[in-house]
Amino acid sequence: MASTYRGVTMNDITMTVVGNVVRDVELRFTTAGDPVASFRVATSTRRFDRATEKWVDGDTHYFSVTCWRGMAHNVVQSVVKGMPVVVTGRLRSREVPRPCGEQGHIVRYHDIEAIAVGPDLARGIATFTRVKRDAVVESEERLIADVLTSA
């Protein structure tokens, strides 16, 4: 059995991808009511070609990104198609059989279960707004109500 530290299994492959969002964020809910946001990121390698003295694109890789619970709500409000992002998370692979003529073959998809998502600040600026969770909001509302009733 794999060990776990802060929710990350030690045998998981954790990776960071810097790229562009290529699909609008979709929000759905599990049967238990947990929010799940998903989007796709494309990343391309770039290298300098000394012969042409120009930067050239290499292969492009696409990753489906899944965000859970509070992060899902934040991503829905913050991430849009075309946005440069940095995504850190656990790599997941899944195989889907696809028919190909007489013989079937398997297509392998690589997904990222996000630990963190943010804008790529090498390509722009951002403004951060801390989100207050329900328990904090309730506590502040009770404090205000107590102050108003005692005045």
Predicted segments — roles?
Residues 1-14, 29-33, 50-54, 77, ...:
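Acidic, gly/ser/pro-rich intrinsically disordered tails
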Residues 13, 33, 59, 83, ...:
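Residue-level preference for beta-strand/loop junctions
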Residues 17-21, 41, 81-93, 114:
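OB-fold and OB-like beta-barrel modules that bind single-stranded nucleic acids
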Residues 27-42, 108-111:
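Short aromatic-glycine-enriched beta-strand elements
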Residues 38-56:
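Short beta-strand/loop turn elements enriched in aromatics
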Residues 52-77:
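A beta-strand/beta-hairpin structural motif
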Residues 68-100:
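Beta-rich strand-turn-strand
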Residues 90-98, 105, 111-116:
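A eukaryotic "domain-to-IDR transition" signal
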